[in-house]
Amino acid sequence: MIRHIDARREDLEPDRQDRELVTRDRLASDLAALGVRPGGVLLVHASLSALGWVCGGAQAVVLALQDAVGKEGTLVMPTFSGDLSDPSTWRRPPVPEDWWPVIREQMPPFDPDLTPTRGMGAVAECFRRAAGAVRSGHPQNSFAAWGAHAEQVVAEHGLTERLGRGSPLEQVYRLDGQVLLLGCGFESNTSFHLAEYRTAYPGRRSHRRRVPVPEGDRVRWVEQEDIVYFEEDFQTMGESCLTRTPGHSRGTVGEAAAVLYGQRAFVDLACEWMTAHRDLARAVGA
């Protein structure tokens, strides 16, 4: 027997009465007030929960972002799938060691249309499926893009320097795009990884990584050398870059704190900051 829930029941408490109702139109208006302009290239990191009670959820956020940049603009979001990695490196949660060979053999290959994001949030997962969106081909660190420069943004994303040379991050840099942190801190700012590739800061290290490269309906495991990422100082670095960057803006979009800034200036300043202040030979947690 199927039981139906009566949505008219009067004993149900209204959802989140202490929060404002946030709509697509309001989000688009708030984005414009923050400084998002039609025709621009915008790399977005967004937290849906930080925005408040959004009518339409992640879909409304994606539509509002599209409204803000317009048809001549370009939106970009990271759509990482970190679970397409060697199971021996999994920590949250780990899996039994006797599972590793089976997982390596049976792992589905990356499919830009089918493979879901992992840990990227509802907005990024919704955005990658938007009409007209395209996704780069890196099995672990793909980006989705929509709009006038979408194809250019994702075209050169190879296996080496996954967030460096040829990556969508570098394409946003070339296009002099902006970054929008929407309810996120600088620890979510993937553009700082581009700076890590460009800077020979003290203590920079590399390691060997295994990447599952699609081969038909299976994967072939390829071992590559890559730099070790370090995000523990991203918030400090970001705040420092803000003090030296004219033209950035802080505000509120929905109920979320938001920061908008030029990516190119931030990456260049981050390179300088790492050279002067970062030493992974001494850093705790490196």
Swiss-Prot record:
InterPro entries: Amioglycoside_AcTrfase, Antibiotic_NAT-like. GO terms for molecular function: aminoglycoside 3-N-acetyltransferase activity. Keywords: Acyltransferase, Antibiotic biosynthesis, Transferase. Pathway: Antibiotic biosynthesis. Acetyl-CoA binds at residues 45-49, 54, 122, 188, 190. GO terms for biological process: antibiotic biosynthetic process; response to antibiotic. It catalyses: CMP-5'-(N-hydroxy-3-aminopropyl)phosphonate + acetyl-CoA = CMP-5'-(N-acetyl-N-hydroxy-3-aminopropyl)phosphonate + CoA. It holds the Pfam family Antibiotic_NAT. Changing residue 187 to A: No change in activity with CMP-5'-3APn as substrate. Its EC number is 2.3.1.-. Acetyltransferase involved in the biosynthesis of the phosphonate antibiotic FR-900098, a potent antimalarial agent that acts as an inhibitor of 1-deoxy-D-xylulose 5-phosphate reductoisomerase (DXR), the first enzyme in the nonmevalonate pathway for isoprenoid biosynthesis. Catalyzes the N-acetylation of CMP-5'-(N-hydroxy-3-aminopropyl)phosphonate (CMP-5'-H3APn), leading to the formation of CMP-5'-(N-acetyl-N-hydroxy-3-aminopropyl)phosphonate (CMP-5'-FR-900098). Belongs to the antibiotic N-acetyltransferase family. Homodimer. The four molecules in the crystallographic asymmetric unit pack as two pairs of dimers. The acetyltransferase fold is distinct from that of members of the canonical GNAT superfamily. This is CMP-5'-(N-hydroxy-3-aminopropyl)phosphonate acetyltransferase. It comes from Streptomyces rubellomurinus (strain ATCC 31215).
